[in-house]
Amino acid sequence: MEQLLAALFQLFEPTHLAFLFAGTLLGLIVGILPGMGGTSGLALVLPFVFTMEPSHALAMMIGVLAPTTTSDTFPAVLMGVPGTAGSQATVMDGFPLSKKGMAARALSAAFSASLLGGIFGAFILSVSIYYAIPIIMAFGFGEQFLLVVLALLMVGALTGDNLFKGIASCFLGLIIGSIGTAPITGDPRYTFNTLYLLEGVPLVVVGLGLFAIPEIVGLLDAKGSIAKSLNTKKGWFTGLKDVVKNWFLVLRCSTLGCLVGALPGLGGTVVDWIAYSHLKQTTKDTSQFGKGDIRGVIAPESANNAKEGGALIPTLIFGIPGSGNKVLLLGGFVLIGIEPGLDMVTTNLDLTYLMIWSLAIANILGAGICMGFSSQISKFTLVPYYILAPVMVCLIFFATFNINRDWYDFIALLAFGLIGITFKNFGWSRPALLIGFFLSTKVELLSYQTHAVYGLSFLSRPVSIILIVLCLATIYLLSKQRFDNNYKSDNQKSKMSQIYYVGFLPVSYTHLTLPTIYSV
């Protein structure tokens, strides 16, 4: 309790609030730009955080992460174009409401639900941290190795349209992550006699290349702007009343968001659809869904923001990224000298609580700014793509050059940009590649430590047996599900009968077929 209160007092230091506010503003901007999101936003600020105090760096990084899933509602509601993957389900009813002249009502309900979901996620994270020590102590090198293997399996299997593509993307990330000096022997690997590759490819370059470059290319191909017209004047109080009226729906979907967010690599890709499906399953009259039902906005938005708190649970406790943007967050930890795991709940507990407080305040700031300045922010969606794209290119190249001030970084950026464009066009999983890249060194070190300390005896330990069973069950169930979906239709992305493991409990949802977002 003492450290919790100390972190609260530190939160309101002017410098900390300034960095948090700056990060929140950047997060709001990248959330509005379709396809950018928290991963690209973090990649932009990462080159600058290594010169900051740890608390200030954490404030800026959390500030970038938290509000992206709030401001992405603007393009989703106003034009039917999801700002990030997490706002796809919001389009289903948000855009029809906008066409009926109720854009303000939809935005107000979305921002309010996002705020409550974000605070709920921060609360769940704080409770999880309190009980984390015995969980961490139960995981030795062998259990950690199997946990990382399970995470890689789930990331590869759940983040793409095809099981093989997802696993292959993850495996390719592991190979790329092994470029450079071997952590055990010190031997150079896949360097092709170039000094640049001895230390491996910088994480920021990989993140920007895979995620930012493909979206900018998409903007260059597009015509016009994100939105064509605005109608955000009337209906703000109606949206607030809608959220209060549906408070139990917010609570249920926020809980779902936390649970799904804790699954490595999964959160942002389907959490909004899980919440939307839950809403349809628990509602008697579903005739208005897809035509402008306000509950179709509240459910995915509350889950989408709550998942950020859930995704931080494996990130902080085990150093396993809960989503693609958490890879960049862990990279920031390395730059400022923070080690995920036991230290986060012991020696660095004050920083952990500071992150939790910052997450809650960033959600409040983000929702407040979006609601208070909605008319002005909405105009940002009217900026033509041909103006946005060059500005974003300049920002990305500046962030890339600031890492090592090495021209080879630009070559690597373009190379990973080509990989990102190829993956995007052919349905391969970019988050799986990024997470595999980040976990490559961790897998290698844990496998060596496990073999050196336990040999094969760790396989007979209780936690190891449970993890092995989960690995095998994940492979079987997801292979079966993907086969069934491919058999039913080659052209339709079906999310029927997916099974996700939350802890040791499966959460299943059915009777939901994903439509083509842009045809709403």
Predicted regions and their residues:
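Hydrophobic transmembrane alpha-helices of multi-pass small-molecule transporters
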Residues: M1-L11, H16-A18, A157, D161-G166, ...
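N-terminal alpha-helical transmembrane segments of multi-pass membrane transport
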Residues: M1-A59, A103-S108, S114, G118-V127, ...
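Membrane-interface alpha-helices at helix entry/exit sites of multi-pass transporters
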Residues: S55, S98-A113, T286-I294, W428
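Membrane-embedded alpha-helical modules
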Residues: S108-S225, L335-N486
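Single conserved hydrophobic/aromatic residue that forms the stacking wall/gate
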Residues: H511-V520
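Re-entrant/interfacial helical elements at transmembrane boundaries that shape
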Residues: G38-F48, M61, A76-P96, V127, ...
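Transmembrane alpha-helix interface/packing and boundary motifs in multi-pass membrane proteins
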Residues: T24-G38, T68-G80, V155-G160, T255-P264, ...
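Helix-loop-helix hairpins and the membrane-proximal interhelical loops
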Residues: M1-S55, Y190-D293, F398, P506-S508
